[in-house]
UniProtKB/Swiss-Prot annotation:
Reaction catalysed by this enzyme: tRNA(Glu) + L-glutamate + ATP = L-glutamyl-tRNA(Glu) + AMP + diphosphate
PANTHER family, per the entry: GLUTAMATE--TRNA LIGASE (PTHR43311), GLUTAMATE--TRNA LIGASE, MITOCHONDRIAL-RELATED (PTHR43311:SF2)
Organism taxonomic ancestry: Bacteria, Bacillati, Actinomycetota, Actinomycetes, Mycobacteriales
Molecular function in Gene Ontology: ATP binding; glutamate-tRNA ligase activity; tRNA binding; zinc ion binding
Keyword line: Aminoacyl-tRNA synthetase, ATP-binding, Cytoplasm, Ligase, Nucleotide-binding, Protein biosynthesis
EC number: 6.1.1.17
UniProt KW Cytoplasm keyword: yes
Name of this chain's protein: Glutamate--tRNA ligase
Protein family (similarity comment): Belongs to the class-I aminoacyl-tRNA synthetase family. Glutamate--tRNA ligase type 1 subfamily.
Source domain of life: Bacteria
Positions of short motif 'HIGH' region: 12-22
Compartments reported by the entry: Cytoplasm
Length: 490
């Protein structure tokens, strides 16, 4: 399939919440399609009605939309190989099954699990070896007898009795030995098609040229290659796609990151205030890199450089601190206007209200852009602007609002009450004169009590700008309250 235009697919099952490992797979497929000028197909594998949910499907759509991973064909937009939901393709699978049986590539198997185990035991083999290919050569009479007993067959593919080898784009030449893979089931006993059938059949019918997926699916590859070869022989497939098995994503210790690990939940990162650029940059580093000496890059730069053959086969560890640091870098790379818009949308989504007008909010955003790791950090720095959210941090007050803060705050109040235009420059001038010149205080001793009294915390945006945003009346009221707190602590 090397001479064909690249067609890749992202085909999740709609169960649970999107996992960062799943999204890493989507990103690598998307980037490879965009790098090669190929097609990114989005397909939903929803044949398990007991586990699949519409809510999970919508969550996957939400994730792709938020991250900007646009697809060229899929369930919401259609395409030449629609439908793109497996639950709507059952007639196609039934037709393929019938053709495989008619060509002798697949057969009806009636053995129960108990019968298979009994045959293994009788032959002195491990009873847990799995299916023993017993039904391969049943006669028509034997099949009729089983049906008369009320048995429903599963359909199994006749596996080739030879090694199966392929050149994995990530792992190199990979071989599974002859006899290690028994004939496998394509359907359940009720005729429902299994993943083992529908996934390769859809790839064949949708002309997928490259399969980029997690290494947990590596053991299923020889079976799928055998099925592709059978599909070629019956005229359903044009060829066998190339495979690239992406490295596992590990959590704490050496365990694979699971859905139970909080950092695996894509939406928890969004709720904290990750921006798409930061999260995608980090996910790209889970198995790939743009250069040995460079970790920060844009999505466009990734697309220009990405080739799946450069993906590392070693497991990648999810490092939350590194992810946070990269997100902070991407927040700093946003223009002031773009950052303001992102922060406003984040605050609105989380019910945070600073009470500022647009111009004031833009100024507040400018003050915190270089001081945060995730958008959620900004509320911790700006919530002092909301009277309902303002609280005096006990530790900060115990440190800064002691008896020696009373004369500092008295002098600050006296200086600020004489300020005409309540601007950053005027506030700075008044406070520096009152505290640094007149009282001859060091800056930390001078401004620490003011910061805690005005913002409630020892860490805040720049002090003079914060007082301007807070406004004259509220600033003076907070300093008076801080002065009373210090006096009471004396």
């Amino acid at each position: 399939m090397n001479d064909m235009a690249v067609r890749v697919r992202f085909c999740p099952s709609p169960t649970g919440t999107p996992h960062v490992g799943l999204i890493r797979t989507a990103l690598f497929n998307w980037a490879y399609a965009r790098h090669t000028g190929g097609t990114f197909v989005f397909r939903i594998e929803d044949t398990d009605s007991a586990r699949d949910s519409e809510e999970s499907y919508q969550a996957i759509l939400d994730a792709l939309n938020w991250l900007g991973l646009d697809y060229d064909e899929g369930p919401e937009i259609g395409g030449p190989y629609a439908p793109y939901r497996q639950s709507q393709r059952r007639d196609l699978y039934r037709d393929v099954i019938d053709r495989l049986i008619a060509a002798g590539e697949a057969y009806e198997a009636y053995s129960t699990a108990e019968e298979v185990e009994a045959r293994h035991l009788a032959a002195g083999r491990n009873p847990k070896l799995g299916y023993d290919n017993f039904d391969r050569d049943l006669t028509d009479e034997q099949r009729a007898a089983h049906r008369a007993e009320g048995r429903n067959p599963v359909i199994r593919l006749r596996m080739p009795e030879r090694d199966i080898t392929w050149r994995d784009l990530v792992r190199g030449e990979t071989t599974f030995g002859a006899g290690t893979m028994p004939d496998f089931a394509l359907t359940r006993g009720n005729g429902e098609p299994l993943y083992t059938l529908v996934n390769p059949v859809d790839d064949a019918l949708m002309k997928i040229t490259h399969v980029l997926r997690g290494e947990d699916l590596l053991p299923s590859t020889p079976r799928q290659i055998a099925l592709y070869e059978a599909l070629i022989r019956i005229g359903v497939a044009d060829g066998v796609p190339e495979f690239a098995h992406l490295p596992s994503v590990l959590g704490d210790g050496n365990k694979k990151l699971s859905k139970r690990d909080p950092q695996s939940n894509l939406f928890l990162h969004r709720d904290r205030g990750f921006i798409p650029e930061g999260l995608l940059n980090y996910l790209a580093l889970l198995g790939w890199g743009i250069a040995d000496d460079r970790d920060v890059f844009s999505l466009d730069e990734m697309v220009a450089a990405f080739d799946v053959v450069d993906v590392n086969s070693n497991p990648a560890r999810f490092d939350q601190k590194k992810a946070d640091a990269l997100n902070a870098e991407h927040i700093r790379l946003l223009s002031e206007d773009e950052f303001t818009a992102r922060l406003k949308a984040y605050f609105a989504a989380h019910g945070h209200d600073t009470g500022l007008d647009d111009a004031q909010f833009a100024e507040a955003a400018r003050l915190v852009q270089t001081r945060i790791v995730v958008l959620g950090d900004a509320w911790g720095l700006l919530k002092f602007l909301d009277e309902g959210a303002f609280v005096l941090d006990e530790k900060a007050a115990a440190k800064e609002l002691k008896a020696d803060a009373v004369p500092v705050l008295d002098a600050a109040l006296a200086g600020l009450e004489g300020v005409g235009q309540w601007t950053t420059g005027a506030i700075e001038e008044a406070l520096k004169k009152a505290l640094l010149e007149d009282l001859e205080l060091k800056p930390r001793k001078a401004f620490g009590p003011i910061r805690v009294a005005a913002t409630g915390a020892s860490v805040s945006p720049p002090l003079f700008e914060s007082l301007e945003l807070l406004g004259r009346d509220r600033s003076l009221a907070r300093l008076r309250a801080g002065r009373d707190h210090a006096a009471a602590a004396a």
